[in-house]
Amino acid sequence: MLEKVKKIFRESAEVKLAFVELYAQQIVDVAGIIATALKDGNKVLLFGNGGSAADAQHIAAELVGRFKKERRPLPAIALTTDTSILTALGNDYGFETIFERQVEALCMPGDVAIGITTSGNSENVIRGLKKAHDLGATTIAFTGRNGGKVAQIAHYTFIVPSYETQRIQECHITLGHVLCELVEEMVCERS
């Protein structure tokens, strides 16, 4: 068991190191886009299913609260938290619409929409990002495996080079933390 534990940690680290080699510059670029949007009075909308929903909520909390520095709250909304909205939309319009309809209600031109899906093929995430794109938001996808359908529709896509859901999710939350740290730094230096 001890060797298994070490192997799992090594695999997690290796995936993250491979990921950062592929995406370091894009991470900086996307952080700048998010910081500029927030500085300009726009907001970040985040969504996903299951563990990806938890990541969306976690990232939103870091932006609205604080990550490392005391600063003004930054407007970010996880579209995964209101059970009345989620169940009403799921019941009345179908589960595939639960993010699309919220995006239609809340998204404005200049906002940033982050859709998180380990497979890249979650229909509700795809539809949410498409709607955000149509409404003039910058769209960002966190995904894995081969990128899935979501890789074809987002302005910026981060594809974790793994086919294991847990490794993809571990990398997604690390990416979220890195973006929060960079965005916070950029917003504070620009204030």
From Swiss-Prot:
Stated family: Belongs to the SIS family. GmhA subfamily.
Entries under Gene3D superfamilies matching the protein: Glucose-6-phosphate isomerase like protein, domain 1
Other observations noted: The reaction produces a racemic mixture of D-glycero-alpha-D-manno-heptose 7-phosphate and D-glycero-beta-D-manno-heptose 7-phosphate.
Pathway: Carbohydrate biosynthesis; D-glycero-D-manno-heptose 7-phosphate biosynthesis; D-glycero-alpha-D-manno-heptose 7-phosphate and D-glycero-beta-D-manno-heptose 7-phosphate from sedoheptulose 7-phosphate: step 1/1
Domain SIS stretches: 34-191
Gene: gmhA
Subcellular location field: Cytoplasm
Keywords recorded for this protein, A-Z: Carbohydrate metabolism, Cytoplasm, Isomerase, Metal-binding, Zinc
Residues binding Zn(2+): H58, E62, Q169, H177
Protein's organism: Aquifex aeolicus (strain VF5)
Class of the enzyme per the UniProt entry, highest EC level: isomerase
A Pfam family assignment: SIS_2
Function: Catalyzes the isomerization of sedoheptulose 7-phosphate in D-glycero-D-manno-heptose 7-phosphate.
Assigned EC number: 5.3.1.28
GO annotation, cellular component aspect: cytoplasm; DnaA-DiaA complex
Main location: cytoplasm
BP terms from Gene Ontology: carbohydrate metabolic process; D-glycero-D-manno-heptose 7-phosphate biosynthetic process; positive regulation of DNA-templated DNA replication initiation
Residues that coordinate or bind substrate: N49, G50, G51, E62, N91, D92, T117, T118, S119, S122, Q169
Statement: the UniProt record of this protein carries the keyword Zinc: yes
Cofactor field: Zn(2+)
Protein name per Swiss-Prot or TrEMBL: Phosphoheptose isomerase
InterPro entries: GmhA/DiaA, Phosphoheptose_Isoase, SIS_dom, SIS_dom_sf, SIS_GmhA/DiaA_subfam
Cofactor mode of binding and number, as noted: Binds 1 zinc ion per subunit.
Catalytically driven reaction(s): 2 D-sedoheptulose 7-phosphate = D-glycero-alpha-D-manno-heptose 7-phosphate + D-glycero-beta-D-manno-heptose 7-phosphate
Cited CDD domains: SIS_GmhA
GO molecular function per UniProt: carbohydrate derivative binding; D-sedoheptulose 7-phosphate isomerase activity; zinc ion binding
